[in-house]
Every structure is written in structure tokens, then in C-alpha cells.
């Protein structure tokens, strides 16, 4: 169910804006997590479809990029803790994650090498700089990011 339909349904039931926002934000977070999965699994079409769905929900491309990069930072942190021999519980504590989420991130890290995650983070900083200096549109920057890392 899209945020729009949920919004109308909740308004008719007298629910507050905060409940609506919480579900919409959760939906966006789920899309971002799924997008990272699609990129990791080299499912380019799926990654782009999720991106276009977020754009249809009026999510700004730079916010999408920010959320993607946040996920990759978490993956980098989780993987660095795994390399040091920490288990799920310790990773959850050190990374400030719920143990379930830590487990999900640990599953995602199997698709990446540390060098790849580092490269993703460096590339995202370069893309952001190119957008801010007007050398690249924000929409295209996210598309390039998704295409590059899902091929």
C-alpha cells in the first residue's frame, strides 16, 4: 500500500499525521534496504525500479543518495567488526543497531569486500560534489551510482 492510500485511509479513521509519517518513513527505509540488496545481488533493474518508486513518492534524489550512503556506512562498520571477530550481539551493541538489524546487515556484507565498500563511500562523496557544483543532476547521480554498483 502506498503512502498516499495509507494517508487517505488514516485520515478517514482520524489518525494523526505522525502515524502517517512513521509508516511512510518506514516504507522509504524498506525501499532503501531492498535497493542495497538489489545492488549487492547485481539486480540492476530491481534497484532502478525501487529508485523510481521512491521518486514517485516525491523523495528527493539527494535524500535517497544520503540514505543509500548511510546504509553502506553501516555495512562498512558491521563488516569491520566482523573482521575483528565480533558476533551479532556485539556488533549490534557497538554499531548501535537492534540485533535483528545487525543480523540483516551481516547477511548483506557477504556480498561486499571491504575495498568495495570503501570505494562506494568515496564514489558517493564525489557524486555529491559533482551535484553541488552543477556538473551533474541529482537524479542522474543516483542512477549512475545504482548502475555502476549493480552491474
Where do the model's predicted regions map?
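Amphipathic, well-ordered alpha-helical segments in soluble domains
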Residues: 4, 43, 50, 120-123
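Amphipathic alpha-helical "lid/sensor" segments that cap RecA-like P-loop NTPase cores
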Residues: 1-15
Amino acid at each position: 500500500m502506498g503512502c498516499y492510500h495509507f494517508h487517505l485511509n488514516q485520515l478517514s479513521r482520524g489518525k494523526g499525521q505522525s502515524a502517517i509519517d512513521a509508516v511512510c518513513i518506514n516504507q522509504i527505509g524498506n525501499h532503501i534496504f531492498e535497493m542495497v540488496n538489489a545492488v549487492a545481488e547485481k539486480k540492476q533493474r530491481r534497484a532502478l525500479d525501487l529508485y523510481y518508486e521512491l521518486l514517485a513518492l516525491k523523495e528527493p534524489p539527494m535524500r535517497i543518495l544520503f540514505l543509500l550512503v548511510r546504509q553502506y556506512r553501516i555495512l562498512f562498520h558491521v563488516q569491520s567488526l566482523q573482521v575483528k571477530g565480533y558476533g551479532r550481539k556485539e556488533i549490534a551493541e557497538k554499531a548501535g543497531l537492534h540485533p535483528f538489524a545487525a543480523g540483516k546487515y551481516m547477511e548483506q556484507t557477504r556480498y561486499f569486500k571491504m575495498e568495495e565498500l570503501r570505494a562506494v563511500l568515496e564514489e558517493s562523496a564525489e557524486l555529491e560534489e559533482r551535484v553541488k557544483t552543477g556538473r551533474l543532476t541529482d537524479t542522474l547521480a543516483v542512477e549512475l551510482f545504482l548502475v555502476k554498483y549493480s552491474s
